Structures are given as C-alpha cells and as structure tokens.
Amino acid sequence: MTQKFDVVVIGAGPGGYVAAIKAAQLGLKTACIEKYTDAEGKLALGGTCLNVGCIPSKALLDSSWKYKEAKESFNVHGISTGEVKMDVAAMVGRKAGIVKNLTGGVATLFKANGVTSIQGHGKLLAGKKVEVTKADGTTEVIEAENVILASGSRPIDIPPAPVDQNVIVDSTGALEFQAVPKRLGVIGAGVIGLELGSVWARLGAEVTVLEALDTFLMAADTAVSKEAQKTLTKQGLDIKLGARVTGSKVNGNEVEVTYTNAEGEQKITFDKLIVAVGRRPVTTDLLAADSGVTIDERGYIFVDDYCATSVPGVYAIGDVVRGMMLAHKASEEGIMVVERIKGHKAQMNYDLIPSVIYTHPEIAWVGKTEQALKAEGVEVNVGTFPFAASGRAMAANDTGGFVKVIADAKTDRVLGVHVIGPSAAELVQQGAIAMEFGTSAEDLGMMVFSHPTLSEALHEAALAVNGGAIHVANRKKR
C-alpha cells in the first residue's frame, strides 16, 4: 500500500530537517528522505552542515585555536605549559564525536516529533509523488500533498585541480587530515578556504591561498576586508590575489600547481591541496522529466519570494535555490514554507541574513556595506569602535579588530553592522535584531549594555555614528 503524507521533505540538512520538525509540530503527517550514511552505514541526518561542514569545521577551528593560544599566549596570563603538542588524530576524533552526537540528536528530535525518516535517494515525480531508491536498488513511491526540495549542495570541481581525496581534496577531505601537511595550498579565499586554511596554519602548516579575484572578501565591507587580510597574513596565510590556477600535477605525495598572475605563469608545490572554490546545488536526478519543476542553467530551482516552485504544492529551500548558501537561511526558509502550507502569512527578510567567517578574529556582518550604499547614492554616517579600547577584550588578550555601524545620514536608521574581532558572530546578531525593528543609531546608543562586555563595542560604535562615543575620540563632532 502506498504511503501518503501531508509533507514529504527530500533532504535532511539544516533546511530539510528543520522544515520536517516544524511541519510535524504543526500537526502535519511528515516524512523526511535522506540518503547520506555515516562510516557505519547508518542513516546520518543533518546534511553537509552537521556531517562535513559547519559543525566539524568549527570543532577543528576551536581545537586549533586553543593549541595556538596554549603555545603562544598562555604565558601572558602567567601560565607556563612547557612543550605543547597536538595529537591530530585525537583532534579529528573529537570532531567526529561531536558530529555523531548532533546527528543522533536530530534523529531523536524526529522521533519525539513524529517525523518518519526514510533512508534512500528521493526523486520528485509528476503529481507530487516521490520515488525513493534504497541502497539495495529497490524503489518505492510515496505520495504527498506538499513536497519540499532541500537536497543541498556539494563542492564545485574544477578541471585544473581534479580532487582525488588524497593529495588534492575538497572541503570534506580537508576535515580528515591525520597529520599536519608541511606545505598546504588552498584554492579559493572564500569562507571555506580561509577557515580550513586557518586550522592547519595554526598547527604549523605553511599555507598559501590562491585567489583568482583581485579583491579580497569582496562581499565584506572594505574596511573589514582590509583588516582581515592584514591580520590573516600576519597569522601566516600567504594570500595571493589575482592568482588563477590553470593546472596541477600529482607526483607521489605532493602536487605541483600552475597558476597565472600579473607576472605571468607560476609554479608552486604542496603536500596537500584544498579546492575550495564554492559549492553547487544538488539537483541532478532530483527531478523526473515530467515533474514540472524548472531549474536554471546552473542547476538552481526557480522559486518565488516564498520558495514556491512552478508546481503548486512543491517548494524548494536552501542551497538548491538562489541566494547565499547558508544553513540559517535554509532553516528559516523551511519554517516559512511550512507556515505557509498551514495557511499562515509567513515571510523572510532576506536583507538581514547575517554572514560569518569563523577565522580568528571572527568576521561577521549584516545589512549593507559602506561601498554598496555609496554606490546606491545613499548618504551615510559611520561609527567605529576598536576592540583595542575595550576593557573586556583587553582582559581576554583579544583586542584585534573593530565594530562598524553604518546609518542613514538623513534618518539615522541603521543600515549595516560589520564586525571583525572576538565573538563577532554573536555581536552581529544584536545588530540584526536592532535592524529588524528599524532601530536608529541613537536608539542603540541609548540602550544600557552590561559592563564589561564585548557588546559595549557595538554600543560605542553606535554612539560614534553621531559623534557621541565615550571611550574613543570622535571623528564626527556633535
């Protein structure tokens, strides 16, 4: 007998599993299809984010930073450690334990909320039917009133550097190194490349980042990207801009990479090479020819502002649709879609989705950059506050970076918050909340912030917008 559901979700990443749980909470009979399995062959929920993305990379970032601090900075606090060593296998094992715990947690949440997990590859057929292909090749077809496509993305492959997951690896392979490579190359100076490059640089690798663009972190505010490049270079990342990789040759346990820059053709040899040039949507074999769902030339599914496809009752969320490939975007899209299935008037504010790079210092922003606003002809006032003037940052021996608040010169409404420094990912969320409610810089300046805290830097930057900062000299006079 054919199984029937109110909602069938294809993909159990941060978009899919959140949508499935929310649907079940709202009383909808829900199933979630996922093909990903762990090393033991068991169903692994959570998608790229939990298994080989957001979570494991943060585990390695935190472990590597603690190692670097113990080796270089504990003496500032009066702590003598002797020789500091890193057990890479133990570090990677800790990461794996965290992943197992969290993916198991999603399974527990499915059970608690009554979501049916189905292991296999999901494919949308005509009439909102979904074909599930099991690992043994058998298939079954289930029916749904509503289908949510949340199949995620995978690393982009480039012909000049074919991944073998041995010497040349993608972001997944870079999480599994069992030893620190002496010479590490990274193709791509984006979020993934900088984070993974930072991990292994802290542990002693000589890291070279090859970026085809001439501009570093183009999406970030110019002041932030300049500070980030300076700081990361000081930490040991050799960032080569305008370096377009044209070829690679693996020789045993090393790889010779050929790239071109302003000086012509160059060659450089690495022990490991990480290809981190972005991700592409996973829509291959997701849709039957008669499904009715439309995709573009790059594999993205066409949707409207509410993630509805061209087929009534079929939706797509997360990395398979246009926009930033962010876990939190996918999750909120999933919730919005389910709310709308239930008849609620839910929507998302795509202008206020925070972006974060988990290097050290962290880099985070929400809203528009100063250069973008100037290009639009918007007059702005800007306030900045350096963490070097923060008592809490000094106490933590973590004073690099600053907070920057941008406000409309006419209305004082906050249009952008940009942070590079300690806990930037947490601080920028305060800016997102303020901007969601149309807060002015003056409003932020009138709020009482706990002392001593890092968040006071946001307070002071907001005050500085109108020349009222207390703990730093004001560029703008009141």
Curated annotation (Swiss-Prot):
<feature type="binding site">
    <location>
        <position position="245"/>
    </location>
    <ligand>
        <name>NAD(+)</name>
    </ligand>
</feature>
<dbReference type="InterPro" id="IPR016156">
    <property type="entry name" value="FAD/NAD-linked_Rdtase_dimer_sf"/>
</dbReference>
<feature type="disulfide bond" description="Redox-active">
    <location>
        <begin position="49"/>
        <end position="54"/>
    </location>
</feature>
<dbReference type="GO" id="GO:0004148">
    <property type="term" value="F:dihydrolipoyl dehydrogenase (NADH) activity"/>
</dbReference>
<dbReference type="GO" id="GO:0050660">
    <property type="term" value="F:flavin adenine dinucleotide binding"/>
</dbReference>
<dbReference type="InterPro" id="IPR050151">
    <property type="entry name" value="Class-I_Pyr_Nuc-Dis_Oxidored"/>
</dbReference>
<comment type="function">
    <text>The branched-chain alpha-keto dehydrogenase complex catalyzes the overall conversion of alpha-keto acids to acyl-CoA and CO(2). It contains multiple copies of 3 enzymatic components: branched-chain alpha-keto acid decarboxylase (E1), lipoamide acyltransferase (E2) and lipoamide dehydrogenase (E3).</text>
</comment>
<dbReference type="InterPro" id="IPR006258">
    <property type="entry name" value="Lipoamide_DH"/>
</dbReference>
<dbReference type="InterPro" id="IPR012999">
    <property type="entry name" value="Pyr_OxRdtase_I_AS"/>
</dbReference>
<dbReference type="GO" id="GO:0006103">
    <property type="term" value="P:2-oxoglutarate metabolic process"/>
</dbReference>
<feature type="binding site">
    <location>
        <position position="122"/>
    </location>
    <ligand>
        <name>FAD</name>
    </ligand>
</feature>
<dbReference type="InterPro" id="IPR001100">
    <property type="entry name" value="Pyr_nuc-diS_OxRdtase"/>
</dbReference>
<dbReference type="InterPro" id="IPR036188">
    <property type="entry name" value="FAD/NAD-bd_sf"/>
</dbReference>
<protein>
    <recommendedName>
        <fullName>Dihydrolipoyl dehydrogenase</fullName>
        <ecNumber>1.8.1.4</ecNumber>
    </recommendedName>
</protein>
<comment type="subunit">
    <text>Homodimer.</text>
</comment>
<comment type="similarity">
    <text>Belongs to the class-I pyridine nucleotide-disulfide oxidoreductase family.</text>
</comment>
<keyword id="KW-0963">Cytoplasm</keyword>
<keyword id="KW-1015">Disulfide bond</keyword>
<feature type="active site" description="Proton acceptor">
    <location>
        <position position="451"/>
    </location>
</feature>
<keyword id="KW-0560">Oxidoreductase</keyword>
<keyword id="KW-0676">Redox-active center</keyword>
<dbReference type="InterPro" id="IPR023753">
    <property type="entry name" value="FAD/NAD-binding_dom"/>
</dbReference>
<feature type="binding site">
    <location>
        <begin position="188"/>
        <end position="192"/>
    </location>
    <ligand>
        <name>NAD(+)</name>
    </ligand>
</feature>
<dbReference type="InterPro" id="IPR004099">
    <property type="entry name" value="Pyr_nucl-diS_OxRdtase_dimer"/>
</dbReference>
<feature type="binding site">
    <location>
        <begin position="276"/>
        <end position="279"/>
    </location>
    <ligand>
        <name>NAD(+)</name>
    </ligand>
</feature>
<keyword id="KW-0285">Flavoprotein</keyword>
<dbReference type="Pfam" id="PF07992">
    <property type="entry name" value="Pyr_redox_2"/>
</dbReference>
<feature type="binding site">
    <location>
        <position position="211"/>
    </location>
    <ligand>
        <name>NAD(+)</name>
    </ligand>
</feature>
<keyword id="KW-0274">FAD</keyword>
<feature type="binding site">
    <location>
        <position position="327"/>
    </location>
    <ligand>
        <name>FAD</name>
    </ligand>
</feature>
<dbReference type="Pfam" id="PF02852">
    <property type="entry name" value="Pyr_redox_dim"/>
</dbReference>
<keyword id="KW-0520">NAD</keyword>
<feature type="binding site">
    <location>
        <position position="319"/>
    </location>
    <ligand>
        <name>FAD</name>
    </ligand>
</feature>
<feature type="binding site">
    <location>
        <begin position="34"/>
        <end position="49"/>
    </location>
    <ligand>
        <name>FAD</name>
    </ligand>
</feature>
<comment type="function">
    <text>Also acts in the glycine cleavage system.</text>
</comment>
<dbReference type="GO" id="GO:0005737">
    <property type="term" value="C:cytoplasm"/>
</dbReference>
<feature type="binding site">
    <location>
        <position position="58"/>
    </location>
    <ligand>
        <name>FAD</name>
    </ligand>
</feature>
